[in-house]
């Protein structure tokens, strides 16, 4: 699975305090934190901090709606960027990855409603 992700992802480096995207932005990619961490927030209110192995930005790929929150890099960070085309290719080629994405989104929705 990781090899397949690596084949379609682009590695990008970000410095501390870099804004990855803002609420309302068009979303055509998602990111996996390879190392470092990012903060998902609405204004100054932190929703969650994500570290190595976490995904961010996947919601906009699935529903094709604008980004629902701001994401800022909290430390020097390496992210793996997956475009929308690569995302759907990955989902279509591996049911385990599709199941994992659905589980991730379901868990985030549960956390948001509790």
Please place each PLM-identified region on the residue numbering:
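Cyclic-nucleotide recognition modules
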Residues: 46-106, 110
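Cytoplasmic (intracellular) domains, linkers, and terminal tails of multi-pass ion channels
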Residues: 4, 15, 88-89, 114
